[in-house]
Swiss-Prot record:
Its main location: membrane. GO terms for biological process: ubiquinone biosynthetic process. It catalyses: all-trans-octaprenyl diphosphate + 4-hydroxybenzoate = 4-hydroxy-3-(all-trans-octaprenyl)benzoate + diphosphate. CDD domains: PT_UbiA_COQ2 (cd13959). This is 4-hydroxybenzoate octaprenyltransferase. It is found in: Cell inner membrane. It is a multi-pass membrane protein. Pathway: Cofactor biosynthesis; ubiquinone biosynthesis. GO terms for cellular component: plasma membrane. Belongs to the UbiA prenyltransferase family. Keywords: Cell inner membrane, Cell membrane, Magnesium, Membrane, Transferase, Transmembrane, Transmembrane helix, Ubiquinone biosynthesis. The keyword Transit peptide does not apply. Coiled coil: none annotated. The gene is ubiA.
Length: 293
């Protein structure tokens, strides 16, 4: 196998060819970066966090495929993944995940001690999440904590502490992750039932649509709470309203539980995150007058 072919396999293993996961992890980090900096981000810290998101999401995907190597060959959507197809060995995958994690850790060395301590928790969450599908009825909640841990780390980097506001944002992200990853899990529900892994789509059963609607509502309510605590302007709530409209659109897409439409709704969640971020950015731009000098 040539070096180019090997690198192509690593790219697929790290899902760099499928950026939706990066975006779903990046949006809550960007929310926190703008909120913690009051709309004036430290561009070096922002760059460190963006690169960290890419590296840790990639490492998490590699660990996920390692953990699921005995399950993936039995699922139509995943049987061609590099480890499942026998093109990358489990040992090779672990070395790749370790290398990506090390690069992410090196990135944050210029930051404060609290960020370094929190990064160890983030590493544990990213590495352990794939195994929760064996034990937890709703592993998507664990995913929400893992995907949202850039939130407390962002506040720690900019404030030197993690305030209550950060935990509200993290809770909002947990509910959002349950919503979008349940949509994703609905795609594979039949296969997951056969192989015996646990997902929120299986746990919620016939109440899946109601649960997703509740999680979207809880996400928006918690984000509105953050806005109320900070006395944010109507622009912030306009972003939340846009996100709410997007959530309603997702519920319409998945109402028949068609796997293709469920996957479409999952992919579309990047616009939910973008709408929230847009509201945050507009609030700070218009408050400071920097949009219309």
């Amino acid at each position: 196998m040539t070096l180019t072919e090997r690198l192509s396999l690593y790219e697929k293993l790290a899902r760099l060819d499928k950026p939706i996961g990066i975006l779903l992890l990046l949006w809550p980090t960007l929310w926190a970066q703008w909120l913690a900096s009051n709309g004036d981000p430290d561009w070096l810290i922002l760059w460190i966090f963006v690169m960290g998101v890419v590296l840790m999401r990639s490492a998490g995907c590699v660990v996920n495929d390692y953990a699921d190597r005995d399950f993936d060959p039995h699922v139509a959507r995943t049987r061609d993944r590099p480890i499942a197809a026998g093109k990358v060995s489990p040992k090779e995958a672990l070395l790749l995940a370790a290398g990506l994690s090390l690069l992410a850790f090196l990135l944050i060395l210029p930051l404060n001690a609290l960020v370094l301590k929190l990064s160890l928790i983030a590493l544990f969450l990213a590495g352990s999440y794939p195994f929760t599908k064996r034990f937890f009825a709703i592993p998507q909640a664990y995913l929400g904590v893992a995907f949202g841990f850039g939130i407390p780390m962002s506040y720690a980097a900019l404030w030197g502490e993690v305030p209550a506001e950060a935990w509200l944002l993290l809770a909002a992200n947990v509910f959002w992750a349950i919503a979008y990853d349940t949509e994703y899990a609905m795609v594979d529900r039949a296969d997951d039932l056969k192989i015996g892994i646990k997902t929120s789509a299986i746990t919620f059963g016939r109440f899946d649509l109601t649960a997703i609607a509740f999680c979207y509502a809880a996400t928006l309510a918690l984000l509105a709470w953050v806005g109320a605590l900070r006395d944010f302007s109507g622009w912030y709530y306009a972003g939340l309203a846009a996100a709410g409209a997007i959530a309603v659109y997702h519920l319409r897409l998945i109402r028949e539980r068609d796997p293709r439409q469920c996957f479409r709704a999952f992919l579309h969640n990047t616009w939910f995150g973008a709408a929230v971020f847009g509201g945050i950015v507009l609030h700070f731009l218009l408050r400071s007058g920097s949009l219309f000098p």
